[in-house]
Regions:
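Membrane-embedded beta-barrel scaffold of Gram-negative outer-membrane proteins
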Residues: 38-44, 50-52, 56, 254-308, ...
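Short loop/turn motifs that connect adjacent beta-strands in outer-membrane beta-barrel proteins
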Residues: 32-38, 108-113, 176-183, 213-218, ...
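Residues that define the transmembrane beta-barrel architecture of outer-membrane proteins
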Residues: 19-23, 95-99, 162-166, 200-202, ...
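Gram-negative outer-membrane beta-barrel transporters
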Residues: 175-181, 285-288, 305-389
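Surface-exposed extracellular loop regions of Gram-negative outer-membrane beta-barrel proteins
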Residues: 2-4, 213-263, 277, 284-305, ...
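C-terminal beta-signal and adjacent terminal beta-strands/loops
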Residues: 372, 380-390, 413-484
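Face-selective signature of the C-terminal outer-membrane beta-barrel domain
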Residues: 18-197, 281-284, 332
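Transmembrane beta-barrel strands of outer-membrane/channel proteins
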Residues: 41-47, 116-122, 187-191, 208, ...
Length: 484
């Protein structure tokens, strides 16, 4: 703050080498014996190979900064708070493959449309992970121990695991027209089993939509259901501490799927203005959350506790206005309010995704009298997210990052406009192209420094200070878009 200013200087050394390889493949076979029935056989595969390797060191100075007290507004150094060095090391390897085989069917019977399916998943995961972090202050490794050399953080993980999942579902969509309007009713149930934790789940859900006969511009809807999110590998990695504070990762086979009871109500209203179509959409929701797996965001890494130790809720309101000024491209304005909270170790704290408000705008239109020139404007203003110190939790203390603010503008010029309906086809070289656009974009027009994460520094009194890392500021981008 202006009354408690700090001066921070750091020199970095080292490097990081990461590799992320992802492969997808899918095969779908569909059989349609008649207009009301269809069947599909689906097979897919997913493979990821990840390597995160770094050795990064830094030497830092943290000083108390003051003001000179005069009218010159100069600054002076008010005392040394910390001098030290740190070293972060990681060799993390993860290989994962997921194979899926499923059968789906759909049958139409009168006003009913029945969908059903069954799917089998086979998951194989290979992980080797070693991380440690060394802090050195005035030649002493922290924490100081007269008998042993210790580091401030050390983690080891070595796992090979194969699991199987089986799921099935059935749902019925019923459509009916009456004297008061049109109804669309959908109800279904999903079953799932996972052999890793021997968990069998039943998930019912229901939704209804209504369009009144008297004014079909309106549409209202309501949905409710019990939903489960089955954990994947990183969510059931559970840290276990020994007497010296070293961490070994174990896989928690007692983990349960996170649960959510959801209630959602919404409405849409379509109308025309300025000789263009518009739609207003409003939606309110409330979700009761249980069996939550708490997590924290450390820089750009998500760290899970690996246990179901929390419960909470999420509620909010979304308002959206859509308009089409350019054919085939929607402009929109959104306003959202949200509150999500959980009970963490007996303390009520906001969840890491608790963004309490957000306003976003996207507008695109042609310039008057210049149909080849198109303008776009995109802006966002949203609340900051809760954050805390590394290897800490929000129940021990947290703060919010500053609000996110950004404005982008763009200009596009049609070097080759799209052919209008009724116009003859182009000949020659340009006959192979549908349209060609040359664009100029200015990202972060106002050159705002938005915080992405924090670098944490510890002083001689073991007090931690958050030094912000900023996202990219203003950028200019030139693009060429060709449609065939």
């Amino acid at each position: 703050t202006s009354t408690d200013a700090k001066q921070f200087m750091v020199y970095f050394d080292g490097q990081e080498k990461d590799r992320f390889e992802t492969f997808f493949g899918a095969l779908n076979l569909t059989y349609t014996p008649n207009k009301t029935s269809s069947y599909a056989l689906l097979a897919s595969g997913y493979l990821t190979n990840e390597l995160v390797a770094y050795d990064i060191s830094g030497e830092y100075w943290l000083d108390q900064a003051g003001t000179s007290g005069g009218g010159d507004g100069g600054s002076v150094i008010g005392g040394e708070l910390g001098v030290g060095r740190y070293h972060e090391h990681a060799r993390n390897r993860l290989k994962a493959s997921v194979f899926s085989l499923g059968l789906r069917g759909a049958n139409g019977i009168s006003n009913h449309n029945i969908n059903y399916g069954i799917q089998y998943n086979r998951e194989k995961i290979h992980e080797r992970s070693r991380e440690w972090e060394l802090h050195d202050s005035a030649g002493y490794s922290l924490p100081v121990d007269p008998t042993d050399l210790k580091v401030i953080y050390n983690q080891y993980s070595n796992h090979d695991i194969s699991t199987n999942r089986l799921s099935a579902y059935v749902q019925d969509t019923y459509r009916i027209s009456s004297s008061i309007g049109y109804f669309n009713i959908n109800g279904g149930i999903r079953f799932s089993y996972w052999d890793f934790n021997k968990e069998f789940l039943v998930s019912p859900r229901f939704n209804i939509g209504f369009i009144p006969e008297r004014d079909p511009r309106w549409a209202v809807r309501f949905a409710t259901g019990l939903y489960y999110q089955s954990p994947f590998f990183k969510e059931y990695r559970m840290p276990v501490y020994d007497a010296d504070g070293n961490i070994t990762i174990e896989l928690n086979n007692k983990i349960k799927s996170q649960r959510s009871y959801q209630f959602i109500a919404g409405t849409d209203f379509t109308f025309r203005a300025f000789n263009r179509p518009f739609k207003i959409s409003a939606e309110a929701y409330y979700k009761i959350l249980g069996n939550l797996i708490p997590y924290e965001v450390d820089n750009l890494k998500v760290v899970y506790t690996g246990i179901n130790s929390s419960k909470g809720y999420a509620t909010g309101l979304d308002l959206k206005l859509f308009g089409q000024f350019v054919p085939g491209s929607d402009s929109w304005l959104t306003f959202s309010l949200m509150k999500t909270q959980e009970d963490l170790n007996g303390v009520k704290v906001p969840r890491p995704t608790d963004r309490r408000y957000s306003i976003a705008l996207y507008f695109t239109d042609y310039f008057p009298k210049f149909p080849k020139l198109k303008f776009s404007l995109r802006g966002i203003f949203s609340d900051g997210l809760p954050t805390t110190a590394p290897r800490s939790t929000r129940d021990k203390g947290y703060f919010r990052t500053p609000a996110y603010k950004r404005l982008d503008i763009g200009f596009s010029y049609a070097l080759l406009p799209e052919r209008a309906e009724g116009q003859p086809k182009r000949s020659g070289f340009f006959g192979h192209f549908k349209s060609i656009w040359l664009g100029l974009d200015v990202f972060n027009l106002l050159d705002i420094s938005n915080v992405s994460s924090y670098y944490w520094v510890t002083d001689v009194n073991n007090i931690q200070y958050a030094v912000p890392n900023y996202l990219t500021r203003r950028q200019i981008n030139v693009r060429l878009s060709i449609d065939f």
